[in-house]
Structure formats: C-alpha cells, structure tokens
Amino acid sequence: MSFPKSTLSEQDLIKGCILNDRRVQELLYKQYCSSLMVLCKSYAKNEEDAVEMLQDGFLKVFQQIDSYEANKSSIYTWMRTIMIRTAIDFLRKQNRKNISVEWKEEHEPVIEAEALQQMSAQQIQCMLQHLPTTTRAVFNLYVTEGYNHKEIGELLKISEGTSRWHLSEARKYLINLLKAKERA
C-alpha cells in the first residue's frame, strides 16, 4: 500500500482538505496511509481491526483538519496523535470491562534489556499480536510512543499500577519467547 508522494505542498494539502476537496483528501490519504497503517497494526489484534482504526482515524482527520496548527507540529505528527487516540477508543469499545490490578514497584521484574534489544521491531510487533489488547496497548504507548504510566492510565482509564502491571506482563512475555527461541 505504498503510494508516491503528492506534488502538492503540505499547506496546499491542508487547505484542500479544509475545503473538503475529495481529490486532495485522497492525496493526503495516499501519502500517509502506509505509515499510519503500521501504527494501527501495532494496536490491533488483526488486519481488519487495523483497517477499521485507520479508516476511523482518517475520518477524524478530515473532520478536524481545520483545527490543525502548523506551528505546533507537522501534519504527520498531528495525524499520528489522532490515530493513536482512535486506536485507544477502538480498544476501549472492544474491552468494555475496566479491570483494575494494583501493582507495587518492588514487584517490577528486572528486565533483560539485552534480550529485547536482540529482537527487531517487526519480531516484537509480531509477538505482541498474541498479547491481550490492553497489555499490547500499554506496551506500545510506553515503549513506542513514550507515554508515562500516569498518561497511559488516563488514556486507557486504568490505574497507574495497572499500567505498570500490563507493561511488566508484556516484557515478561517477550523475554520468555526469546528464551524459548534461543533454546530451540
């Protein structure tokens, strides 16, 4: 799903989208859909969910494009933020139950950083697909997007302790898979 970059400037793309020009909206979509699809796949359990997240996200982009402020961020960064929030909303809808698990700092396992560094991003994302939805979302938000546990808790409507627990579970899962791979 790779498309050539648009010949229009970023400003012209934004202006066209604000004017609801379908041709320009299609150009914006084609320019960014591949990289944003990768982002959606990192949150989705399957391809269909990722496509739904992407489509919902682009709908929000086009509906909110007039609120984009070029002096604050690039259009890609702004759209990426919308996609992340759309993915979280999607996960929330699918995971209506609000589980709260309290986790104390002293129970945080020592993470074998070297083991995780040996894995490619693609290997990690493939392995993450087997994790529960919330655990995968916490891992992505913390490791990939750089959110802290307080921010993750607010986004996912879970406690900071629950966020820490999900991150710990994701890391333990990845390390165990890596150890099993080394033994094979």
Describe each model-derived feature in a short phrase.
Residues Y29-E47, Q64, R80, L128, ...:
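Amphipathic, Lys/Arg- and hydrophobic-enriched alpha-helical face
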Residues I14-V38:
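A short, charge-rich alpha-helical start-of-domain segment used by transcription regulators
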Residues M1-T7, G16, C126, E154-K157, ...:
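C-terminal edge and immediately downstream basic/flexible tail or linker adjoining helix-turn-helix-like DNA-binding
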